[in-house]
Amino acid sequence: MPLRLDIKKKLSTRSDRVKSVDIHPTEPWILASLYDGNVYIWNYETQNMVKSFEVSPNNPVRTARFIAKKQWIVTGSDDTYIRVYNYNTMEKIKSFEAHADYIRCIIVHPTLPYILSSSDDMFIKLWDYEKGWSNTQVFEGHSHYVMSIAWNPKDTNQFATASLDKTVKVWSINSPHPHFTLEGHEKGINSVEYFSGGEKPYLISGADDKLVKIWDYQSKTCVQTLEGHSNNVSVVCYHPELPLILSGSEDGTVKLWHSSTYRLERTLNYGMGFVWSMNFLRGSNFIGLGYDDGTVVLKIGKNKPPVSMDQGGKVIYAKHNEIRISNISSTLEQEVQDGEKLSLQSKDLGNCEVFPQSLQHNSNGRFVSVCGDGEFIIYTALAWRNKSFGNALEFVWAEDSGQYAVRESTSRIKIFKNFKETHSFKPSFSAEGIFGGSLLGVKSNDTLCFYSWDSADIIRRIEKTSPKNIFWSENGDYLAIVTDKSTFILRYYKDTVQKYIESGQPIGELGIENAFDVVHEIEDTIGTGLWVGDCFIYINRSSKLNYCVGTEVVTISHLEKHMYLLKYLPQSGRLYLSDKNLNIVSYKLHISVISYQTSILRGDLEGAERILPKIPQDQRNSIAHFLESQGYKEKALEVSTDLDHRFELAIQLENLDVAHEIALKSDSETKFKHLGDLALSIGEIKLAENCLKKAEDLPGLLLLYTSTGDIEGMKMLAKLSEEKGQTNISFICNLLLPNSLLNCLNTLCASGDYSEAAFMARTYLPSMVPDMVEKWKESLKSTSSKASDALSNPIDFPNLFPQYDLSIKAEKYFESLRSQPKSSFDYLKNATAQSLSKKQRNLLEEIESVSQQDYDKVLSQLQHFSLHSGISDITTTTTNTNNNTNNTNNNNTASLLDDLDFTSTTTTTTTTTNTNTTQKVASPLSSPSPIRKNDSIASPQKQQQQQQDINITAPPLIDPSPVDHDLVLEPTPIINTVSPTKTSPTADLSFLDNIPVDHDEEDEF
């Protein structure tokens, strides 16, 4: 039967005539040299051009090759020059005249720093690129153009050449003369290539006589001649993996011949003109073709190698028709790292009469099936004796070790048991593939049917699906149906099916409805897979080794290249994988972890607890993440050994004790910040404060202290934030603290915000307005003297600041009120309620109506409520007032300013200024000196002397009870100094007379 060929076109590009092609060994690139003098590099996966080189305009580039280890391309053209380029940087590395005529071919030595070039000058030359591209040997012997060269893969010191003198000559790099000559073609020979597989000493040639000849270079005879082309044969090669000979001709076709039977298997014609060049990538299934009209890349066959492993660790694989065996058990006592290539000894097991395209052990490992060339053969696994054979496009084993099925054609399926046919049936659709396992699966282009192995009855028909593969679990309870886009995990109810069959009910076209249930869909493209218990292990298109338990997918490893799963061996606890070159690696698979996860998914928590002690410590974190994903966060917190993960779980569970313990161990500001936020949200104020301090979360501390009214905390935060340079926090703290408004002005001035400082003083601290205005004026002089002169000081221009004297009185009034403890506010609140019951209060009117005598009286009586125990004494300043100013209304503002002398520090505002980037204040602003008409601001020395003259120490409180140290942090009312439009009535302040006063201390005032 014909060889099953899976041919896919990976690239097709249009261009000028392509004289040579070469495939990169590691990148998905093909190099094409053109008749127009250009060289292109194409990516055959993305279909895009990667690089373009203009090598020799108007001179054909007849040959080009990759030198991958140097990241070079080397070209030969009709101008007789060899040129070398770096294909990454596009830099020209070397250019030299190599021959006296057109350069026809260049090949690169697989290991040594050599290239060979041939030319129409009839010479072959050897070049050493590690020695400055020196010419180390010249080979002479042909009498016509030398068209092609090929290295012998079995002896890389030898090479063969083809010439238009109708001969093939075999050479050694150590001798300038040929060892022997092969003659037989009637016309010039265009191409020569060695057979790379097996032990056959063959080479192949194609010539202008339209023939392809196979030569035995040991006996120096022609073994076979292939006829079929209708024009000159331009190029020939052996497929690197499949038993194929490929030949390209000027008749526009590529013919595929079986290398053992020499039967023509397939003819390809892509309508792109003459075939000029062909190249293969050793170890792969990619073939590059160069045509008159462009470049084509084909993938012939599948990458999956013919290899199988039994439960004992014996690996049987095929190298062409040769069968070899290795034993994994020799490595079980060795310490092997995950992903490490295993060093295995192999031995010949025998040969196979067909070319193996698939190779499979049965369930007990006693027999091995080989399928290929449209036939199957069953061998004994140990002695490699033929047990059975027959025709088959595909072969699959059943779960029962003695049953198997073959697909003879698209219309005939046969089932065998103990090497005897038991059933033969014709599906109702075109059978495009079959799958083994607990049931026999048969697919068409859009349908999947499952059949009973014993009766061939349909069990279930699934429409609109055509899987790539099906993997059954060992107990037959689960299966994975792999499609192009996703994989479906199904549960098979064998007991339900068995009862239905035993009931004798007829089975319809769709089979038994309750035979399967969809458990989960894995949205991933899967290459190979296998089951270990109820765990499905697979490799996806991204070369990730994953396993799926229930609905949870876990990545075991990221593979460096695509690999294929072989088997899991319980005795070693490892998974074994193979690449396409039959290099075998392994990865540790912890069955205890999978068993634990399976128990959790089944709800068997007691069973999971029994398994937990068997799980290694280095796998506890993966278990914890699994438990978290399943909603068992408390259990995950117990199991996890990762501090970061445990902290996250403790935060989610609001377990403050565990979270605090972990935060202390790790000493992480981030952890303290998260813990502080959580503690604050659930009312653990003390813990929140400690965590926010350790995290240096100043905004969080500000929120905490303002919410709880912690004045000591506010003081600490004001100092800390200033040290840390977060002056916006410091500003807000001082804004809310009693007697700290001056610090706010200091902050604004330090940041250069003199205008804001002046306006803030005008609103909340009128006594500081002159000083702030002067600083503002001074700051403007360097930029705009005109703007500086336009600013007015309330001392120099009192007419521009009406009622300025009232704002100063209000400042003193509210300063006294703010200096009281909470207990005094409760008393005043009761007294005020009596007044409010009579009429509505108007605070502005009260302030304007206060006489100097009343003001002094209030001030003296409020001294008894000053905070001197644990906070600070209130230092008030006053001066002898004019005894004659007892009138209710102040008619002369100027005289009042002459008589008032004070210092102040108050709190309040809602204004905030971001001054994080400003410098710290070098020294705090001085309290203002007494303001007198037509006087300038007093010097600091004078201010200090005046303050010493008028400072009054607050007397002790009358009430011996402890003073409440917490202050009420309430924004101070804005002092509006705008003049009222009409005269305000005198305020009723008689309630102030009721404030108890210690008369023994009154004389001090």
UniProtKB/Swiss-Prot annotation:
Q: Which portions of the chain have biased composition (kind: Polar residues)?
A: 919-929, 974-987
Spell out the Pfam families in the cross-references.
B-prop_COPA_B_2nd, TPR_COPA_B, WD40
SUPFAM superfamilies in alphabetical order = WD40 repeat-like (SSF50978)
> Repeat WD: residue ranges?
13-54, 56-95, 98-137, 141-181, 184-225, 228-267, 349-389, 391-426
The UniProt entry lists the main location of this chain as: cytoplasm
GO terms (molecular function) for this protein are: structural molecule activity
The alphabetical list of record keywords is: Coiled coil, Cytoplasm, Cytoplasmic vesicle, ER-Golgi transport, Golgi apparatus, Membrane, Protein transport, Repeat, Transport, WD repeat
Tell me the PROSITE patterns matching this sequence.
WD_REPEATS_2, WD_REPEATS_REGION
Point out the coiled-coil segments of this chain.
829-853
Q: Which family does it belong to?
A: Belongs to the WD repeat COPB2 family.
PANTHER family per the UniProt record, alphabetical: COATOMER (PTHR19876), COATOMER SUBUNIT BETA (PTHR19876:SF2)
Instruction: Return the protein name.
Output: Coatomer subunit beta'
